[in-house]
Amino acid sequence: MFINLNPLEQFSVYSATSAILGSSSNSLAITSLTNIAILFIIGLLVLTIFQISASSHLIKPTRWNIVLETWVASILGIVKDQIGNDAKNSLIYFPLIFTFFSFVFISNILGMIPYSFTPTSHISVTLGLSIAIMIGVTLIGFSKHQLDFFSLFVPKGTPLALVPLLVLIEFISYSARAFSLALRLTANVSAGHCLFGVISALSVSACIAVSSLLLKGITITLPLAVLVVLYGLELLVALLQSYVFTLLTCSYLADVVNMGDH
């Protein structure tokens, strides 16, 4: 079946072509329709946040305005701390960083809704984001420093004999940033959702196995209490992973933007 009443269905990938054409073979894509729909919704939410934050000039701000202003100020603070207090750089890169943070955070939060979908739990989404980030960072480095960009792969004071080896190591390290950025986010988000599924399944199995009403109540109440606590922790993880993703993106940008300052 295409749709199952299973909270872990979001981890199953259904081919978009097979879902539309009814064929499970020779599919041309592995992107699920749910993924496409949720990404579209998240994009609309991010644009809505931008629009509201840009058009709200109230003398007495509402709570929503205060939340948005705090949101914007926090991301702007990260950009300034990592890339520098230069107003020009902050204004240039802030919209990009803010968009990445908003996208990842909203994706993580939407995934906390039962029977919903978490795009960031799929490596195809996070790897696509991280590869796009590293390509963009590389292009920015080339545009600002031209051929001097390659000095990033040669640490200062390196003996001439060690230059080929260190260039290879630095290049591999630079390329691996995309994979580490994607895997970190996917692993942390997926781990929490899998833990929810395991505890829920054990609770249902234990409830079916026992016959006493008292024991049934215990097997339902205790796991439910644990799930509530884990739910709160997952909300914190959703925010924390968004922050880490944004912080690392700013750090990678700072490496190429401020090359001449090191």
Swiss-Prot record:
Q: Which InterPro entries match?
A: ATP_synth_F0_asu, ATP_synth_F0_asu_AS, ATP_synth_F0_asu_bact/mt, F0_ATP_A_sf
Q: Which domain of life is it from?
A: Eukaryota
Alphabetic keyword roster: ATP synthesis, CF(0), Hydrogen ion transport, Ion transport, Membrane, Mitochondrion, Mitochondrion inner membrane, Transmembrane, Transmembrane helix, Transport
Entry-linked PROSITE patterns: ATPASE_A
Q: Does the keyword Transport apply?
A: yes
The record's annotation in Pfam families points to:
ATP-synt_A
Which CDD domains does the UniProt record give?
A: ATP-synt_Fo_a_6
> GO molecular function terms here?
proton-transporting ATP synthase activity, rotational mechanism
Q: Where are the transmembrane segments?
A: 30-50, 64-84, 91-111, 123-143, 149-169, 195-215, 220-240
Q: Offer a single GO CC term for the protein.
A: mitochondrial inner membrane
**Cross-referenced Gene3D superfamilies, in alphabetical order?**
ATP synthase, F0 complex, subunit A (1.20.120.220)
Q: Where does the protein end up?
A: Mitochondrion inner membrane
**Topology with regard to the membrane?**
Multi-pass membrane protein
What this protein is reported to do is described as:
Mitochondrial membrane ATP synthase (F(1)F(0) ATP synthase or Complex V) produces ATP from ADP in the presence of a proton gradient across the membrane which is generated by electron transport complexes of the respiratory chain. F-type ATPases consist of two structural domains, F(1) - containing the extramembraneous catalytic core and F(0) - containing the membrane proton channel, linked together by a central stalk and a peripheral stalk. During catalysis, ATP synthesis in the catalytic domain of F(1) is coupled via a rotary mechanism of the central stalk subunits to proton translocation.
Q: Which family does it belong to?
A: Belongs to the ATPase A chain family.
Quaternary assembly: F-type ATPases have 2 components, CF(1) - the catalytic core - and CF(0) - the membrane proton channel. CF(1) has five subunits: alpha(3), beta(3), gamma(1), delta(1), epsilon(1). CF(0) has three main subunits: a, b and c.
Protein name per its UniProtKB record? ATP synthase subunit a
